[in-house]
């Protein structure tokens, strides 16, 4: 159901590779019955220097993360915050790749279902030429402050997602399966909206976090 709990999240990282690079910030909001009910915002100590280009993009520098908890401490808290919810992100493949890789690295078993708001935007806003977060926000008259800061991007994405839920209901779409079918059938859609699923199994009992 589209009224199920969702956790809309965004991460900032030291680069684009989930294997080679590290998370430096996680921001998330929990959406239940179409309203934001809780927020999660934390810096993460990547244990490596933040590249200058990332500092320029995000405004996050080494002094801001040096006293922060590491991903080993932060990730279980984020997963607890997200418990029982479908994950949502803008360009979700990128954000989820880091979450999935870190779960594997820490031996955390996890079963994710997640939705990409880029796919939703392509279906519901076919007149747009680009689907970047700031472009979609502008089209929906949603303000985006401090772009490329995780909690602000997550809050903006949540507002977008709540509007998308309303737009779906106006089209008599009330669950993810019907949404998938609508995405496939829309002549304007660039690609269908996938509901992604990822299952991470701990490879050994050693270092496993429950």
Positions of PLM-derived features:
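Conserved non-catalytic scaffold segment of RNase H-like nuclease domains
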Residues: 1-112, 126-148
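Phosphodiester-processing cores and adjacent nucleic acid-binding clamps
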Residues: 7, 92-93, 97-99, 103-148, ...
């Amino acid at each position: 159901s589209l009224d199920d709990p969702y956790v809309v999240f965004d991460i900032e990282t030291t680069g684009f590779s989930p294997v080679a690079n590290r998370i430096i910030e996680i921001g998330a909001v929990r959406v239940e019955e179409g309203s934001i009910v809780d927020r999660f915002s934390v810096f993460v100590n990547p244990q490596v220097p933040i590249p200058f280009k990332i500092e320029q993009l995000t405004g996050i520098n080494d002094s801001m993360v040096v006293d922060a908890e590491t991903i080993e401490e932060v990730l279980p808290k984020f997963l607890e915050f997200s418990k029982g919810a479908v994950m949502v992100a803008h360009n979700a493949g990128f954000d989820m790749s880091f979450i999935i890789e870190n779960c594997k690295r820490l031996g955390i078993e996890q079963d994710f279902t997640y939705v990409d708001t880029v796919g939703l935007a392509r279906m519901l806003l076919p007149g747009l030429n680009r689907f970047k977060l700031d472009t979609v926000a502008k089209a929906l008259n949603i303000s985006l402050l401090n772009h490329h800061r995780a909690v602000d991007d997550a809050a903006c994405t949540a507002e977008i997602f709540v509007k998308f839920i309303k737009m779906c209901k106006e089209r008599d779409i009330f669950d993810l399966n019907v949404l998938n079918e609508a995405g496939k059938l829309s002549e304007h859609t660039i690609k269908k909206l996938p509901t992604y699923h990822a299952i991470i199994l701990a490879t050994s009992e050693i270092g496993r976090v429950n």
